[in-house]
Amino acid sequence: MNIKSIKQYILAGTLCCGTAAVTTSCNDFLDILPMNDVVLENFWTEKADVNSVVNSCYEALQNSDVQTRMGVWGELRSDNMVMGSNVPNEINEILKENLLESNPMCDWSKFYTVINRCNTVCHYAPKVEAIDPNYTPDELRATIAEVSTLRALCYFYLIRTFRDVPYTTAPSIDDSQNYILPATPFDAVLDSLIENLELVKDDAVRRYYTDDSPSAYQNSSRVTRWFTYTLLADLYLWKGDYDNAIKYCDRVLDFKRQQYKEMLDREGKLDNIELYDGIPLIMERKNGSTTCGNFYNEMFGTGNGFESIFEIYYRANQGAANSWVNSYYGNSNNVLGRLAAPDFLFENVAEGKNQLFKAKDCRAYEAIQASNSSNAIVKYTRTGSVSFTTQNVRNIASLNLQSQRRSDSDANWVIYRLSDVILIKAEAEIARGGDDFTDAFLLINRLNKRALGITQAAMSADTLKIDDYANSRDKMESLLIDERQREFLFEGKRWFDLVRWARRDGSTRRLTGYASLKYQEGVNVIKIKMSDPNYIYFPYAKKELKVNPLLKQNPAFNKGEDSELTK
C-alpha cells in the first residue's frame, strides 16, 4: 500500500472532534492555517490537543466504511448470511464467492485512517508531555496504551482479511517520507502487535468512572486495560500461544468477578446478574421472572452492559450512525435488511427440530425473525424491550415475543464481550488438550445454560452433558465451533473463526464444509474455489496495486502461481 496516498485523511481529518468519548474542541487546530498549509507541530502544545486527536481516533472507528467492512469481512462469506432485500451488487458478488479486486469492499483506506491517527498520537503526545505540566507521565502512558490498542485492533482486522498487509507504526506527516511499503507477512504483523501491546498493556486505564456513574458507558466505549488484555488473548489464540491466551482471559475474568462483588456490596442484591459456576453473567430471565430477553436488552438493546468489554459507541443525533445495522440488518421501516439468515439456522427451531439451536435457546429468537419467505436478522435492530417466554415453547407463536425496532441508527457495535473471553479460553484449553477438556466444557456449558434461561433456582442443571464431548478432541472442537456460532451470530466473527481454524488445520476442508452449507446452487464450484488456501482471504484493491508497485496481489487472484497456506 502507498500510505502516502492516505495522507489526505490525516491532513483533512485527523484532528476533527471525536464523538465517542470527550468533546474537546478542535477549532484551535483548524483555525491555524489553511488546510493545505497545515503545520502539525503548531497544534501539539497542551493536553487538550492530545485528547482531541485521541477522540478523532474513535470518530474514525465509527465511520460507516469501517463499520460496514467489519461486518462484511468478518461475517459475509460465512454460513451465517445470504441475500436479503435490495442487496447491492458488490455485496451480492461476495455472497456468490465472486471476489474481484475491483470490489469496493476490498478498500482498506478507512482502517489506515484510524491507524495513522493513532500513529500520530504516539509520535506527538510525548512532545506535549515535555512542555505541558498538566499532562502527566502517567497520562501519557495511558494515552499511548489507548491508541496502541485501537491501532492493533485495526491491523488485526486487516491481517485476518487480507493476510499480509503494509505495516508501519510511523505517522504519515512529512512529504519527504517514503511510505510506499510492501506487505508484511501475517505472522510478522501478529508478533509485532503482541510485542507492542505487551509493552503498554498495564498502562491502560482500568476504569474511567464508577459503575454507578451516568458516564460509566465510557468504561466499555473507550479502551481499558481489560480490552487490551482481551485483544492480547485473541492475538495469542491466533498465534497458537494458548498459555498466554488463557493467562489474559483469566485476568479479565478475575476483574469481572471483582466488579460483580463490588456491585453486590453496593446494591445488596442483583436480580439480573448471577454466578454461573463462579463466573458472573447477565441472565436471560431475571430471578423471579418468567420472561426472557434480559440479556439481549442489556447487551444489544441498551448497550454498554455489565458484560461489555469494548463496543463502538453510537448515539442518535451525534453525527455518527451505525449504517451497517440499519441498512444490512433492518430498521423500523424494513424488517428485512439487505442481508438475511439462511434457512438452516432458524427452520423448525421452536419445534425443537433445528440442527444448531435447541427450542429453548433464547439466542435464536433474539437474532432471527421469520419475514415472509426469508429470515430477517434482528440482532442489534431491536431496542431494549425484547420479551418472550420459552417455558412451553411449541412454535413461534407460543413465545409471545414482544419487541420494538430502532428508529435511529444508534446500535452500538460490540467488538468484545465477556462471552469472547470465556470462549477464547475454552478454545485455548481444547487446543492444549488432556485435562483441559473438562474445564473447556464447563466454560462452554455456562454460556449454554444462560442461553437456555437457567436461573439461580436451577443452576445445578446442565444443558449439555460432559460425557457426550469431553472424551474426544473432535467432539470438543465441534461443540466449541457450534457454541461460538450460536453465541456470536451476526457479530462479525464467524468467517474469521473459520479462517483461524483453517490456518490451524493447515487445510480449508473444515472451512469449506461449514461455509458451503448456505448454498443451494453452484456448491461444487464454490468448494473448488475455497480449496485454494489463498482464496480464503480478500484480494488487494485494484487502486492500491496501481499506486504501490511493491504490493503483490494474492496468488489466488493471480492464476498460475503456487498456492500454499500460511499457518
Language-model features, listed with the residues they occupy:
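Bacterial Sec-dependent N-terminal signal peptides
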Residues: 19-46, 193, 233, 426, ...
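A short, exposed helix-loop element centered on a Lys and neighboring polar residues
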Residues: 27-71
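Short, surface-exposed recognition loops and adjoining beta-strand edges that mediate ligand/DNA contacts
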Residues: 41, 68-85, 168, 206-226, ...
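Elongated scaffold/linker segments in the mid-to-C-terminal portions of large proteins
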Residues: 45-49, 54, 58, 65, ...
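Conserved, well-structured interaction surfaces
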Residues: 51-65, 86-162, 178-191, 197-207, ...
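TPR-repeat structural position
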Residues: 242, 435-437
